Every structure is written in structure tokens, then in C-alpha cells.
Amino acid sequence: MASPLQIRDHLQESYADVYTAEALAALTALAPLDVRRRERMAERLARRRERAAARRPLAFLDPDTLIPGTTIRVGEARAGEFDGSEIPPDLERQWIQGTGPATKPHAPVATGLRNVAYALLSGADGWMFDGEDALGQIATMSLDNLRNLRLAIAGDPLFLTVAEQVAAEMNAWAEGFFGRPIIADWRRQLDFTTRIFRCRGLHLDDRHLRHGDGSGFSASIADLCLYVVNNQAALRAAGRSVVLYLPKIQTAGEAALWNELLSALESHLGLPDGTIKAYVLVEQLEACFQLMEIRAALGRHFVGYNTGRWDYINSVADACAWDPGFVNPNIDAITMTYGYMRIYEDRVRRAVNTPDRNGRCALWQGGMETNIPVGTEAGVQAGMARAVAGAEREQRAGASGKWVAHWKMVHIVRPVWERVGEANQLGRVFPPLTYTPAAAADLTLLEPAPRTVRGARDLISVALQYGNAFAQGQQAAALKPADFFLDDDVLYLMEDMA
């Protein structure tokens, strides 16, 4: 039997609306699975050390082996011999998903709720409220984030008051930028956007919870229980799905552990298996070697993949750190059409469009648009043209939609999918995935591109700026290299922990 949980600094009293009796019961029920989480993380580090010592690149799995934590063989997963999920109605059209936290550092509740109001009034088809990379991990921000989401999802009067004020401010900005308002009826607009939550990754411990013996407690389990338990009834009563984003998954074995956590929580709450839906961010090179296996391991919970950029570039560099011949070019040269990034995106779209045994495919949500329309007129025009061109490329490539890092970008990028009018990419046909040595080598394909001192300066400059923001709890910050501080034609980009 699991030890009782410890909650630090009397937070159970001050956050009684987050640490509810129901949520604490779920945390206690899932706590025994934290042992398996620690085992998976130890295996992750051991694999990395072993590969580096042997100077061995990543490879595809043996098709005859079982996916750890499942009864599914690798070859069966690749052939679609598993039961996937139907796409629920409120996820069938996700042309634009916004991202960002539901609070601010050291903010009163009403101030933090402004973040939620901007998100739900933005016109985005979905909004991923972030408990991970974009959320500061100082003080009680993780709990403030969850409190604000509960207030918004429940339609608390304080949230509605804030939303009315924010709607007026958003329309004032839109009148100046577009020449028209973007919100006709703010109450009705609040109902448009699908609510999505991103938990923290399996590698992290929570800062407020401990096991009874004083050892660290999984941040993933904490986020999963505190969000789902406190909000699932209100979401389902409103006809909404319970939707998560799962970050930093590296292997199908880790995905199987997530599946076990989701199923255990559903069982604890008396919900049918597969009630909780999950997107997976493909942020790790190793995961790109196991895309069908991860889909299969998550089974009826899995609805789609998202193709990120910054985390994935970093993971490629990390996986190849043992190889002195692997040197990335300047970061601005590593676009989604560059070498290994192009291969990565192509494998993701092939994986989601491989049907399961019931003929069901999954969704591909395109990558992040980090531009924000703040700067000189010429700079904004150029930045928005790049943003629209990038969205058009992803739509043609088969993405069901993409991410934006700021609410102001929703009405700039969403028309790309509106003009086409297709709800999603389901039904498009792409070549089947291959698992040859050449396909493996392509996942670290370098192509000619600049490697310059300026590129190094840019990275160092942005890292210093981000470190300063991070220390203040601003894990999502508008940044640009210092060499361009005086050039307003060069726009700031929204960046988070990636």
C-alpha cells in the first residue's frame, strides 16, 4: 500500500480548491505507479549512457519484440494491428491551437485569469493551457495554473467579469490592427475553444508533493490527477472532451506507462477506458523511431501528434553528442524543411495516416508559430507574411492545423485553413513508413547551411535573456538576439523552455 502523501507548507489549506478530497484520493490511488515511472526514467538515462559509450546511433526496434508494458509486438504496431481512438467531435477541427499558461508569476487570481480569458476569447479552435514548458515553476505557479483553469471551466463569476473586460481590450486592439472587432458576443465566444491541458513530463518531480517517506512525487501524476479530477465532470457536462498533451515521451514503453496512468485514473473515477484523450508532442529523436509503437501503446487514448521544433532540434543534438562529426548549423537555418526536420515531419504525417485495425487514423497538428505582430509596420508585415507562408506550407503538407504562441496570431494564421475548408487531414494518403538503415540515417540528415559566429552569438544572447526570464517565473518570453535590439524590423519571438 502506498505511503500517505505529504503536501508542503500548509498548501492543502490555501489551495483546498485544487487539493480537493477527490483529487487527493486519486493521487493516493495512482501513487504506486510512481515506482514504475522512476524505473522508466532510470532506463532512459542508462540507454543514453550506453549509446554514448558505444558510439552507437539510434535505431529502429526489432519488429518481433514486445512493446514494454503491453502485449503488442512492434511489428503489429507498425501494421496497425491495435485499437486506436475515434476522433471526438470537438477535436475534429483544430485548425489553430493556441498555447500558454493560465497564470502569471506572483499574480493575484484576477490577473492570472486574464491569461485564460485571452485564450478562450481568441477564436482558436483549441487552447493548450500549459503546465510544462511555458509555465514558470517558481513559488505556487503550478497550483495557481490549476486553480485558474478550474474557475474558468466552471464559469466562475470572477472569471466572467475578467473575460468581459478582456474582450473589450482585445476588440480595441483588433480595431486598430484589422480595422474590425474579432469578438461579437464574448459569452458565446468563450464556448468556442476546446480546453486542453499539458502535463509535465515523466522526468520531473513535483515541488509541493512528496511520498510519505519524503521521496519525490511525479509531477506527471500530480498534474494528471489535479486537472482531470477537478474538471472532468464540468467538461463532460458541457459536452466537451477531456484532452491532454503529453510531453517529452521518448519511447513506446514510456507511452505505455502514460496509458496505464490514464486507464488507472479512468478506472478510479468510474469512467470508460479511453475517455481521456491525449495528443503527444514529438519532441524527441528517439520517439521518431517509434511513432507507430507509441500510437499503439496509448491505444484508445491517442488522438494525434504535434510536430515541435526547438525541443526536437535539441534532442537531435543530444542524441548525437557522442559524434564529433555531427554539428548543427545556425539555428535559424534549421527550419521544418531542413534535412532531418523534413524527414521528421514526413514520418509523423505518415504515422498518423496509417490506419489501425478499425480503419481509424489520427491527427497531425503542425508546429509552433512564434511570431507576434509587435514592431514596425514593415517588420510586422514581413513577419506575418512569413507566418502565413509557413502555415500554407504545413497545410499543403497535410497538417490538420498548427500552434500559435500568442492570441494575436489566431486571426492571422487561421484563414489559411478556413480558405481550404477541410476539417482535418484524415483520409489523405501518404506512402507507408519504412524501417530501413537508410530511413534511420535520414533522421539525422545534415544538409549544407551556415555555421557562423553570428549564429553562436544569437544562441548565447537568447540563452542569457531566457535565463533571466526563467529565474523570474516567465517561462514564456518574447526574445530576439541582442544584435537586433535596436532594429524594430526584426520581431520578437515567443519562446518557452524549449
Regions found by a protein language model. Name each.
Residues 3-33, 40, 52, 56-82, ...:
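Conserved alpha/beta-domain cores
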Residues 49:
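Catalytic domains of riboflavin
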